[in-house]
Amino acid sequence: KKISYIFLTEFNKSKFDKLIDINSNQVFVKPNFVSRKGEPSKGAHKRVFIFASRLEENKGIKLLLELWKLLPKDYCLHIYGDGTLKNFVEENVKENISFYGFTPQKTIFEDLSTATALVFPSIWYEGFPMILAEAMAIGCPVVSTNIGNAGDILVNSKGGTTFEPDKPDTFINAIEDVLQNNKIYQKNALAYYSETLSKDKNYVLQNDIYEHLFGGG
């Protein structure tokens, strides 16, 4: 029998291709879809960046707090989430870093709608980071590490920019880039959502795969 595979990103597909020699007609890429959890971005009015994730080592919160020391004092970081590093985060709150703990999604997305960008500093491979997709769904740009699927999503969507976790200068450059080109990244993020991540478009992608598999494609 013929086995086919569906991957969430081109990055996943490329990793699989290196492990198994398989006909390209048996391999497909279809990301998860997301629904909008807030109004499309109203545009960034100030230098506010959002971290919204579990407070764990692999999510890069320690890395982010260390890198934030390199930025000007008027670059504000809002941290949402809970986890084993909660006490560590609380101890590192400064005048330009605010910690809100576990917060309802509605409040987080209201903040995202006027933020400069979501910051996603994960230091491990992720499956399909839904917060990236949800941020882009409302036109909020993303600054992410260039690791695995997260980096792949940013490269393909052009809805933000990436940095190398072990090179602080690339983080500073990424933050400045998203500030200077915010409107462009907002537009790209919304376009990527409409063309790839929306429920309707995702249905079309899924249906095309089924047509290919069962319709003699």
For every predicted segment, state its role.
Residues K1-E39:
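Donor nucleotide-sugar binding/catalytic pocket of nucleotide-sugar-dependent glycosyltransferases
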Residues I6, N32-V34, S41-K59, L65-K69, ...:
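Conserved donor-binding/catalytic core segment of Leloir-type glycosyltransferases
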Residues F88-K106:
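Nucleotide-activated donor-binding/catalytic signature segment of Leloir-type glycosyltransferases, i.e.
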Residues F109, L132-A137, G151-D152:
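Short alpha-helical segment that forms part of, or immediately flanks, the ligand-binding pocket
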Residues S113-G127, C140:
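Acidic donor-binding loop of glycosyltransferase active sites
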Residues L132, P141-S144:
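Short hydrophobic beta-strand element within catalytic cores of glycosyltransferases
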